[in-house]
Amino acid sequence: MTQDELKQAVAKAAVDHIAPHLEPSSIVGVGTGSTANFFIDYLAEYRNDFDGAVASSEATAERLKKHGIPVYDLNAVNEIEFYVDGADETNESLELIKGGGGALTREKIVAAVAKTFICIADESKQVGILGEFPLPVEVIPMARSHVGREIVKLGGDPVYRDGFVTDNGNIIIDIHNMDISRPLVVEEKLNNIVGVVTNGLFARRPADLLLLGTRDGVKSIARGA
């Protein structure tokens, strides 16, 4: 199977997982990226079975609307039953690196609200220790140099994502060669830097369920199992 076929398989598995639980009042949180896009396409088949969605990016909102799925502002909903999103890396504890597409802050907010966070990924994203994929950090523009210096103090190599602006109007610094053997500690240290909005480590709020696309089919891995 190609990587796209693996992504399609896990996206369909996620829809199959949540479909029996959808009610007319249900709100589904939807992530950003290529795997999330496949999820949206499959979710559209059930658009009459639930109320609507909360999107983690403008691009996701646009795709949902094209399928006729109502998109709500997060402040307008009381709860989100499921949040489904991809990842750039995942470890065995279902701690993640996300934000390759630059939507990490909104993704982290929606994940924090959701009762169940389902991560969908192909097997290339599963790693022993996080950090081979550069760790994105969303930064207030005027703090760019300061944050970069602080990242160096923590042992990382900061690289400005030139020309990229987040949906929130901020910039991204990608951290290379960072020791992330203790994801929760690193997440908190980075978030404590003045000028950082948030970083792409999902350790305080890891996934509850990982649907992993492999050559042998989709594996379902629950956190703590």
UniProtKB/Swiss-Prot annotation:
EC number: 5.3.1.6
GO biological process: D-ribose metabolic process; pentose-phosphate shunt, non-oxidative branch
Domain of life from the UniProt record: Bacteria
Active site (catalytic residues): E107
Binding residue positions for substrate: T32, G33, S34, T35, D85, G86, A87, D88, K98, G99, G100, G101, K125
GO cellular component, one term: cytosol
UniProt cross-references to NCBIfam families, sorted A to Z: PRK00702.1, rpiA
Subunit structure: Homodimer.
Role this protein plays: Catalyzes the reversible conversion of ribose-5-phosphate to ribulose 5-phosphate.
Protein's recorded name: Ribose-5-phosphate isomerase A
Gene assigned in the entry: rpiA
